[in-house]
Amino acid sequence: MNANTIIAGALSVGLLAVSGPALAQTTTPEWRTVAPENLLVIDTAKGRILVELEPRMAPMSVERVRTLADQGFYDGLKFHRVLTDFMAQTGDPQGTGEGGSELPDIEGEFQFRRGRDLGFFNIATGQAGLLGFAGSMPVFTQPDAQMMVTADFKTAAQALFCPGVVGMARNQNPHSANSQFFIMTGINEGLNGLYAPFGRVLAGLDVVRTLKPGAEAANGQVDDPDMMTRARTAAALPERERPVVRVRPPSSPAFTAMVEQVRAERGTRFTVCDLQPIVEVTGG
């Protein structure tokens, strides 16, 4: 397998929020609980990272990561490539960026079809569509009106590579994702539409940012890197060891209040990447 290297590519969507609609206060649950099968628990010597997997947007990627994690494949694997304010890459048994699992490569899941049941919450209007959240993921999408003229009554959408978003690494072949993945610590719009986002860090982004970085001159390759000591879905852990994670829905009053606060602080520079999920973690 050729090196799985994450590089900037063609910009597919502008993240700058050129206008922002008033956020309506609707009747909505104050919290939602992340399903154990969609909670990836990554332990490191630096601390724990909790990732919500998003099978509605990248089902093959999520199934692959679940399978490998619960097999113990990721235990002891290195964060072999880490670039400050960009991303941390792991999941290679060789620790070089050249390796993968024995499972076949999967197709690139760079976009998905959004139906009304996804629960997209519009936050702003971008250059060519709507910007908002679905679950904990930042999303760019065509308006709902497009659903009326499509055969499946859905519209095109893609999750965005904001801080905390987790994506599948690949080589130059767009359908070469296997076991490696990367966790964003900064914003890189050039990845949008070119790599498959499949989840988001809900807790532990500060841990990711403390992982030992590599030099830019070495393309982020790390000498004596940090590693994942264990990675499992919460569903695969003994019940007494399972963390319980609750997230404020994007339409909740608490989240919408945060949006307006951040929008006021950032002004014309406001983007969906300025927003992080509001999370509560207990147990584990």
Please describe what each predicted stretch is.
Residues 1-10:
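Bacterial N-terminal signal peptides that target proteins for export
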Residues 11-12, 22:
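Cleavable N-terminal signal peptides
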Residues 22-284:
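Cyclophilin-like peptidyl-prolyl cis-trans isomerases
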